[in-house]
């Protein structure tokens, strides 16, 4: 039964994506206007093939032998845990007339899914998933037959799904009602805090074993085949009592209408309900050339509309509250990823017209130039800059909060904070924040994974406690007046138990045991975390690097600007994975530093060795990745976040 349930879930899950046949409209065009979320994958198979053939990453890391080895390792893990073996998986597919190649072919075509949210007067809002894929006539027939066979096999089981064949919009539809069974937890109380010992846990488990199972709702699934396309709808109904009520029936009828409209629209004409989303200037400007991987679209207005209706508040009150935040005129959000001319690109856009207001007014502050400061060394793997006057943002938030109904209480809180700041630092909170300047710099150094693991092993043997932080980060601010920050660090030193600030290369500061270090000097405030980061950062501020040791003077900013023009932006970043290998390189370094004995579960040690052998070597990873860059900008139409990475050819 477990394997049957798994294959049913797989078959239905595969139907959560989309595709378009020539005779039918694209399925996304058939979605209703109250669609809150949609994801489309135009062709994963072709995209995968392109990455394998045109990038070194694909040729090496995604090569057939490595993928086969990975599949074998995963199957080995499942087999060791008694879940399923590779042979059992293949037998399960064959039993239902399917092969692995049938599932792989599904990914070659377009697929997608969506979520519809609909308000219902005096009833729970209806959430329904609509999905589509295009496996072709043969593939769709196989999947539908497999689902039917599994439903027939489970017909005699307790709480078995109930299948009903119906007709909607002139199409045959298989409707399935799957009971939702939950334990009746009335009278089963959790132990009070401090009483959750082993005995209490055993007693709780025993009470749960004896709890009565009851039917609390049903999940309805609708499946139809249309010209080689598999269309699926699914939604949940809940009962007011175990026997059900009229609300459950009303929910089913609403789902039937939604799915019928979805089917009918495939052969219809006219403008798609979501066409207006794609016409929003911010969304249209986020289009990407090349081969797309995925497009995700969210319509917050649909969710807001449902929540408004559920709140019972009048529209004016709701709009006023949204305006305070600054999202009363928010539009759609889109996320796109693609590969084009040796570059992996991603963009996220949100319709949020200028001028922004409410809390989001802070996003309209002037932006600094996107550039790397002189003190950043070539050793840094990632550099980021946030352009924002925190003091001005603080004042904006304070002004808005003071205007609210609880304004007097908020004013008292701000007054206390300012008085404390004046007493300790000689200036108010806003002045302290603005004193940091508008450029907030963040530096990421390559992690020292091997060193940290070695320390952890030694500490485990000796019983000593040591810091095992592998991350190596720094945040730097250029400040005009060091006085308030020296006083602030003095207070921090007292709290840390040291009492006095320490001297380091002409800087004053404090090191938090097992944590970060904070230092002030030479017109800069530095926060550092990780072995050697403080010393390197302070030295670079004292004597800025030049030539090959300088990130600013290297080819990294130039190559990054070729990916995305380095215009003034709210956020800016560059990264260099040519040496570190990015996330894959970190995984490789972790695997190389680990030993089988580091894994407590003995049964997993063999799997670890197998997975370790599958990772590319340092030599294989040379030239696998290149330069990356990010930009976060506010346009007249909204927010635009862009990223791009070099993906060198084999």
Residue ranges of each PLM-predicted region?
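Bacterial N-terminal signal peptides
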Residues: 7-17
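Structural boundary/hinge residues at secondary-structure and domain interfaces
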Residues: 21-216, 273-334, 339, 345-466, ...
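Helix N-cap motif at beta-to-alpha junctions
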Residues: 134-139, 235-239, 479-483, 530-533
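Short, intrinsically disordered low-complexity segments
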Residues: 168-188, 507-534, 612-625, 635
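A conserved glycine-rich beta-strand in the N-terminal activation segment of trypsin-fold
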Residues: 212-306, 513-605, 611
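Loop/turn-rich, solvent-exposed surfaces of beta-rich toroidal or solenoidal domains
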Residues: 463-482
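C-terminal regions of mature proteins
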Residues: 478, 616-650
